[in-house]
Amino acid sequence: MKSYLKFLLLSLCILTLASCSGEKTTQSAASTEQNKKEIIIGTTVGDFADMVRDQVKPELEKQGYRVQLLEFTDYVRPNLALADKSIDINIFQHKPYLDDFAQSRHLDIMPAFQVPTGPLGIYAGRMHELSAVKEGSSVSVPNDPSNLARALVMLDKLGWITLKTDINPLKASLADIAGNNKNIKLVPLEAAQLPRSRHDVDFAVINGNFATSSGLKFTSALYLEPGYTYVNWSAIRTADKDSQWVKDITAAYNSAAFKQYAFKRFAGYKYPESWGIQATQPASAPAK
């Protein structure tokens, strides 16, 4: 009986020590995250990277952070890098894309705050006027599902194609094209390749960040996407949502200094809804 009691007491001691050790480990991890002073930011090349270099990095460094910028040329690796902790936050995508990617890849990531975003637009390729479209005209479009959907909705508004009426426009696909009277030839490409595709197609649908990084001006667009559904968001790991560094970087992107910088440097962009101001109106579609 005494041996049994000794064994029981020993077991309880071991369990208590293990519990305390686990609690200390959890508290230590939480403390480390709260005291985090190195932030790795991932963006696509171009405007989002410029925002970090010009304004956000200097502001965070004033607060004692060490900031590293990693630039990507595609829309897949930034989210995978975020999920595997190669980076701490990424800035390149709108919410429909983020939601779809996170769900399909089973990633525990979430939106944090909006950032100024260049609108999707149709730019001249071999043809320089929308009215020049003809039978068999070619149009390069983004090949990722959410941005392809945006392009299809734009072409539908222009009357170049007709989409089914009972679809979710945020998820429109090639299979949802109900009519193509002009036999428009769609050429899906990675978004980063779209500016260079203009020499090979009649028109190109180009994302705002890649348009500006290739030297295109929004004023040269033949048509700009209306609405603000696709203003881009930053993305973080869900576990980090209450971290102090997330609060600090959010504040940096919403500071008066950053807003003034954005209004001057990125005139014509669509700004975060929380700012309560939009500088431009999108080009309107011609009558069908």
What residue spans do the PLM features occupy?
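C-terminal motif of bacterial Sec signal peptides marking the signal peptidase cleavage site
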Residues: L15-S19
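Short, polar/charged alpha-helical segment
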Residues: E38, V45-Q68
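Ligand-binding "clamshell"
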Residues: D100-A112, M127, D200, V205, ...
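Bacterial lipoprotein signal-peptidase II cleavage site
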Residues: C20-A30
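A bilobed periplasmic-binding-protein/Venus flytrap-type ligand-binding module shared by bacterial periplasmic
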Residues: P119-L130, Y230-W245
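Periplasmic-binding protein-like
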Residues: A149-D156, Y253-S274
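A conserved helix-loop-strand patch within extracytoplasmic ligand-binding domains
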Residues: A112-T162, K259-Q260
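Short helix-initiation/N-cap motifs at beta->coil->alpha
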Residues: L69-L80, I167-R196
